[in-house]
Amino acid sequence: MAPRGFSCLLLSTSEIDLPVKRLLSSVF
């Protein structure tokens, strides 16, 4: 649903949250 750029930016912003980062990476 969200653009790849947005997801990439989101991952960049939450680089501290590794679990969340991995989860988002798996979702997107």
From Swiss-Prot:
Keywords: Cytoplasm, Secreted
Cellular component terms per the entry's GO annotation: cytoplasm; extracellular region
Induction: Down-regulated 6 hours following staurosporine (STS) treatment and up-regulated 24 hours following STS treatment. Up-regulated 6 hours following beta-carotene treatment, returning to its basal level 24 hours following beta-carotene treatment.
Presence of the UniProt keyword Cytoplasm in the record: yes
Expression sites by tissue: Highly expressed in testis. Also expressed in kidney, heart, skeletal muscles and brain.
GO biological process, alphabetically ordered: negative regulation of execution phase of apoptosis
One example GO MF annotation: receptor antagonist activity
Compartments, record wording: Secreted; Cytoplasm
Family matches, as CDD domains: humanin
Pfam families the record matches: Humanin (PF15040)
Family from the record: Belongs to the humanin family.
Entry function: Plays a role as a neuroprotective and antiapoptotic factor.
Listed name of the protein: Humanin-like 2
Organism lineage: Eukaryota, Metazoa, Chordata, Craniata, Vertebrata
